[in-house]
Amino acid sequence: LSGANKGFDRVKGDQMGMLATVINSLALSSALVAAGVKARVLTAVRMEPIGEFYNKWRAIECMEAGEVVIMSAGTGNPFFTTDTGSSLRGIEIEADVMLKGTRVDGIYTADPEKDPTATKFHDITYDEVLKRGLKVMDLTATCMCKENNLPIIVFDMDTVGNCLLYTSPSPRDGATSR
């Protein structure tokens, strides 16, 4: 978005962001495979042989075969965030939960990297996230999760082992910090 303010084409910027998610997906896939975990990269834009083109049924088929499916390139469309892409894909495949890895260990009253007085929530409803204007995810992604009852778990992705900890959530309305 900052480049758009300087005259850069927003669509091209969003496409670069989509490509960056593919690069990250390839890195994650490589790390998983090196650890002995089957992994597959699916992309929202065609770019075989780098990754397979995403469709719901292929994603489910791969997961049922025991593979970790890494969905990349957001929705494949500009003007949609990766949060919205993740929410959309989670809803499509009827996921039990959306895991949001970030630089902080949960949801706070403000950005704890900028505000040392920020307080962490342990559980919070979607409505409260929206009412307080918390920047957990963008508005579209949060509303999609709310409307489709997709729980969100926010965790610190830089803490080793966190991804493995958050694979069996309990049912809840809204988002959880752990």
What are these regions (language model features)?
Residues 3-69, 84:
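Ligand-binding beta-strand-loop-alpha-helix segment within the catalytic cores
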Residues 6-9, 57-60, 114-121, 172:
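Short, hinge-like loop/turn segments at secondary-structure boundaries
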Residues 12-19, 89-101, 118-131:
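Gly/Ser/Thr-rich active-site loops/lids in small-molecule metabolic enzymes
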Residues 20, 26-35, 88-96, 144-148:
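Alpha-helix C-terminal capping segments
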Residues 21-22, 29, 69, 73-75, ...:
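Polyanion-binding loop/helix "lid" in catalytic or ligand-binding cores
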Residues 26, 57-109:
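Internal active-site segments that recognize and position negatively charged phosphoryl groups
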Residues 41, 91-116, 153-160:
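Acidic, metal-binding active-site segment of PIN/NYN-like and related structure-specific nucleases
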Residues 166-171:
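Conserved small/polar residues in nucleotide/adenosyl-binding loops
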